[in-house]
Amino acid sequence: MADESKFEQAKGNVKETIGNVTDNKNLENEGKEDKASGKAKEFVENAKEKATDFIDKVKGNKGE
């Protein structure tokens, strides 16, 4: 899923750049939205991973 968020960020960057070069504000804004969405998904993925790691660590220390 991390690849999906990175792809969304890259797609957004391309749209934003093309929109900027062609003076197409709609495409530029769509690109900015895609980038922000991709970054948000990546943040959530990282938070989930850290929470899971923490829970696993706590569970592992219970038996000791």
Curated annotation (Swiss-Prot):
Organism domain of life: Bacteria
Chain spans, region Disordered: 1-40
Chain intervals with Basic and acidic residues compositional bias: 25-40
Family: Belongs to the UPF0337 (CsbD) family.
Protein name: UPF0337 protein SAB0772
Species per Swiss-Prot/TrEMBL record: Staphylococcus aureus (strain bovine RF122 / ET3-1)
